[in-house]
Amino acid sequence: MKNIKKAIISMIAIVGLSTNVNAFEGLSVGAAYSSLDFSTSGSEVARGAEGGGAMTVNKTTKTGSGDIGSIFAEYSFAQGSTIGIDYISGSTEIGKASRTEAGTTSGTVTASAAISNPMTFYVEPTYMVNDVFGVYVKTGATSITVQPKEVADAGNVVTSTYKDKDIWGIMTGVGAKYYVGNFFVKAEYLETEFQTYTHTSTTGDK
């Protein structure tokens, strides 16, 4: 998997634990709605029937989009800058491709990959234009679990087994926020580029 481009349309939170110095300073918790566009690329070096045949290289690139929700907690300083953590529960498929096995065993093998439970740690250096409106840059690190899987349409076709693996990505973006009483709204554009997942399967594929 190569990268995920993430555009957050809106984010609403309830601000708590504010101080008398600045009504926006303190701990905030809330929920976010995100509209995602992602692109993934992958390749597999297959060793043929039961791991003993000639090696072949299968490559694919996939793009997609989706809408997700997340929860977050963050702390804002009196100047307006913020540190926080964002968490998404669940999993989603990010790519699928098929190949045809021939020889002593024949059939179609479908490989897919899913990601689950993304968690992002972030900072938002902020410039407050006035008392209620600010703009910021955002950067952070995101951890996700990659879950590859292979299935075959025939019982005599040997499939590979891959391990789930946690990988990290670097997130960057820009945004703006607006405060209304003890509430605030954010609009952001973010991009995250992840590490490459690599693994040698139980049959020698990788």
Model-derived regions: residue spans:
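Transmembrane beta-strand segments that form the barrel wall of outer-membrane beta-barrel proteins
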Residues: 29-31, 83, 139-142, 186-193
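Gram-negative (and chloroplast) outer-membrane scaffold detector with strong preference
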Residues: 24, 35-37, 69-154, 178
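Residues that define the transmembrane beta-barrel architecture of outer-membrane proteins
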Residues: 55, 65-69, 115-119, 166-172, ...
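Extracellular loop and loop/strand-boundary signature of outer-membrane beta-barrel proteins
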Residues: 54-60, 105-112, 154-164, 197-205
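Surface-exposed strand-loop-strand hairpins of Gram-negative outer-membrane beta-barrel proteins
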Residues: 36-68, 160-168
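Predominantly the C-terminal beta-signal and adjacent terminal strand-loop region
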Residues: 92-94, 172, 178-206
